[in-house]
């Protein structure tokens, strides 16, 4: 067995093979990735000179409601076993929670996988009782009751799945910033073990503007 075969065998031993196999990258794929990176850098450069509340990745590029801005938090689930769960309450920065009576209109989850991701996950946001410890049994029951929409995110060979966002409208509930600690992001790894940091979840919380928001997000 040569060195490359030995390395491959060691890698397969450490991790159970996925349900499907990826096709070998083509030159067209490589060119597409390079072009995407160039466009991304160009967009960042242009955006830096145009402060605006029309955030390019928020609510599908919708404009924030008049008098509102948003706060983003990033969640990186730890390793999740096959057919198991992860839950994390929404904890905003102290500079935001200081204004706990400011209304929250919407919560959006954006799913961004790392390159090694090739699985299926279910993602949702739920209002969770303070007494809940977000155990596997508790999260499983919340996914099963059908009381909230669920984003099914699947591996896409061409890159990020087109539908990678889930939007929750809380305006009718008169929820405020102080209520956000009662909500949690829940993840179900359906088909495979999800490795540490294999998935990144960006949670955008649109809320009434607060005095500390002196600079518009871009």
Swiss-Prot record:
Residues bearing PTM N-acetylmethionine: 1
Subcellular location per the Swiss-Prot or TrEMBL entry: Virion
One GO MF term: structural molecule activity
Chief location category: virion
Region entry Disordered, spans: 1-29
Biased composition (Basic residues): 11-21
Pfam families xrefs: Cucumo_coat
GO CC terms: ribonucleoprotein complex; T=3 icosahedral viral capsid; viral nucleocapsid
This protein's UniProt keywords: Acetylation, Capsid protein, Ribonucleoprotein, RNA-binding, T=3 icosahedral capsid protein, Viral nucleoprotein, Virion
Entry's family note: Belongs to the cucumovirus capsid protein family.
Role this protein plays: Capsid protein. Probably binds RNA and plays a role in packaging.
Domain notes: The N-terminal arginine-rich stretch does not seem to be the major RNA-binding region that allows formation of an infectious ribonucleoprotein complex.
Full protein name: Capsid protein
């Amino acid at each position: 067995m040569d060195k490359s075969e030995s390395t491959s065998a060691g890698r397969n031993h450490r991790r159970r093979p996925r349900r499907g196999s990826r096709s070998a990258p083509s030159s067209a794929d490589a060119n597409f990735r390079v072009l995407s990176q160039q466009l991304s850098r160009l967009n960042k450069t242009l955006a830096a000179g145009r402060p605006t509340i029309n955030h390019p990745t928020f609510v599908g590029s919708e404009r924030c409601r008049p008098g509102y801005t948003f706060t983003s938090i990033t969640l990186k689930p730890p390793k999740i076993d096959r057919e198991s769960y992860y839950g994390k309450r929404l904890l905003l920065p102290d500079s935001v929670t200081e204004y706990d009576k400011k209304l929250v209109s919407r919560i959006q989850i954006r799913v961004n996988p790392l390159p090694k991701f090739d699985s299926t996950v279910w993602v949702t946001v739920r209002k969770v009782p303070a007494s809940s410890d977000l155990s596997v049994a508790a999260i499983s029951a919340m996914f099963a009751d059908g009381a909230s929409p669920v984003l099914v995110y699947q591996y896409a060979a061409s890159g990020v799945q087109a539908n990678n966002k889930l939007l929750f409208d809380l305006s009718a509930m008169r929820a405020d910033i102080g209520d956000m600690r009662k909500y949690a992001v829940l993840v179900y790894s359906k088909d495979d073990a999800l490795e540490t940091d294999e998935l990144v979840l960006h949670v955008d919380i649109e809320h009434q503007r607060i005095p500390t928001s002196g600079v518009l997000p871009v």
